[in-house]
Design a protein with these regions (language model features):
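Bacterial N-terminal signal peptides
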Residues: 12-22
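N-terminal secretory signal peptides that target proteins for export/translocation
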Residues: 1-8
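Asp-box/BNR beta-propeller blade signature and adjacent active/binding-site loops
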Residues: 25-436
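Intrinsically disordered low-complexity regions specifically enriched for long asparagine
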Residues: 10-11, 32
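Serine residues within intrinsically disordered or low-complexity segments
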Residues: 7, 22-24
Length: 436
């Protein structure tokens, strides 16, 4: 793991200057952890190490606007694949072998996320960019959705900014955005329901905070800082609290997972702080690799910032920043097997969609495997649930097709044993308990 630990204190100065410029997953003592479907929340590793399997199929196609894939898995194992730009969803009830008809849904369009509440079985999407904060909820594994009001509480730094006169931006169409800020969930990975530790049952999802202190800056003037953060709910989605900001600015489109000891691992895209992209690369030579941090308090604060040189931040076509990547933890008892996805072309074209595996909770990433060599951009990952048709498989939903990165979305299904036949990265070793 590469990087330097950084203090979060400069964030206060940067943001203020810019503008002054418990529910729980069902479990009783001694009993197995179960979801609302009565299925185990976690199981053995062996099911992911069966005979290597790989297949792939197109789920959405169209012109040049097949953008922003979101993937979630309901407690019964139903897969939900969302095409964000078109507010469309397709479901698979047989582990990704076949996909149902396209459903028009209200949960997408440039501000989307999905969170599966394993205790209640509901699937939720929090929308906070356009007008009043809203929550969309499905009680039938994504077939239908209802709209609810929800409350999103600001964190302490946001309150400080509001005291200086900053106001929440309420419509995306505002031309004069100076002196405003907004939260959004654009291009973040699916949220999680915490299973372990003091905050078990908490719903947690990544988000982004964007301030607008001034009009569009000049090419060599810093843009307004963008900060990854998270939203968490301890009441099933009725109210949400904004976490502290990620310990580095110019970050967004992030992903998070819970580790087996209850810690939260946060992995974020890096976003350019300058409109002059050559200037951005000169000042931030590590622009095209991922950032990571951890939380020991259920996602409220973040610490131990690191720059992850082994994980590319995808292709930016020379623009000095990365793109949305996928992240999931396999539901394995007592182990932290993580899978990450992105284009293996840091800073170059958006091609070579690849997956990486970690067996020690993101300390090392010793193996990777190419999934799709042609065009490939944003991606999303989930792992199959024990006791369902999805069990033992990993699912990658990504932008990409033979005619371009944004002309199709495909779902690849594969086993961990398939990844293990890939390329060693030199960043740590695959442990014996995996290879046995």
């Amino acid at each position: 793991m590469c990087g330097t630990r950084m203090s979060g204190k400069p964030i206060v100065c940067l943001l203020v200057a810019t503008f002054l410029c418990s529910c729980s997953v069902a479990k009783s003592p001694g009993q197995e952890l179960l979801t609302a479907a009565g299925k185990p929340a976690e199981g053995p590793l062996d099911v992911f190490l069966r005979e290597p399997l790989f297949d792939m199929q197109v789920v959405f196609d169209g012109g040049n606007d097949v953008r922003e894939p979101y993937l979630a898995i309901a407690v019964d194992g139903t897969l939900l694949a969302v095409r964000n730009y078109k507010n469309q969803l397709r479901r698979s009830e047989d582990g990704g072998r076949t996909w149902g008809d396209t459903i028009d849904v209200p949960i997408a369009h440039s501000d989307s996320n999905m969170i599966v509440d394993e205790n209640a079985g509901d699937i939720m999407s929090v929308r906070m960019w356009d007008g009043t904060d809203k929550l969309f909820r499905s009680k039938d594994h994504g077939k239908t959705w209802t709209e609810e009001e929800t409350v999103i509480q600001p964190n302490e730094l946001m309150k400080q900014l509001e005291n200086t006169g900053a106001k929440k931006r309420v419509t995306k169409g505002e031309q004069d955005k100076s002196g405003t800020y907004y939260l959004h969930a654009n291009a973040g990975e699916a949220g999680v329901a915490l299973r372990h530790g003091q905050h078990k049952g908490r719903l947690l999802v990544s988000a982004t905070f964007r301030p607008h202190a001034k009009a569009h800056p000049s090419d060599r003037e810093p843009a307004d800082a963008i900060f990854s953060c998270a939203l968490f709910s301890d009441d099933g989605g009725a109210t949400w609290q904004v976490s502290d900001f990620f310990p580095e600015g110019y970050t967004e489109e992030a992903a998070l997972v819970e580790l087996h000891d209850g810690r939260i691992y946060y992995n974020s895209r890096s976003h350019s702080g300058y409109y002059d992209k050559a200037f951005a690369r000169e000042l931030r030579p590590d622009e095209n690799v991922r950032r990571e941090a951890w939380s020991n308090d259920g996602g409220q604060t973040w610490e131990n910032l690191n720059i992850v040189h082994v994980l590319p931040d995808g292709g930016g076509y020379g623009r000095g920043y990365g793109m949305k990547g996928g992240l999931t933890r396999l539901p394995v008892k007592g182990r932290d097997v993580l899978i990450y996805s992105n284009a293996d072309t840091a800073g170059g074209d958006r091609k070579k969609m690849t997956v990486w595996a970690s067996f020690d909770g993101a300390e090392t990433w010793p193996v990777k495997r190419l999934v799709y060599a042609p065009h490939g951009a944003y991606s999303s990952l989930v792992a199959g649930r024990p006791g369902t048709a999805s069990e033992g498989l990993i699912y990658l939903f990504f932008e990409g097709g033979p005619n371009g990165a944004y002309t199709a979305m495909q779902v690849a299904r594969f086993s961990l044993s398939w990844i293990l036949a890939g390329e060693r990265t030199g960043n740590g070793d695959v442990p014996e308990w995996v290879l046995r």
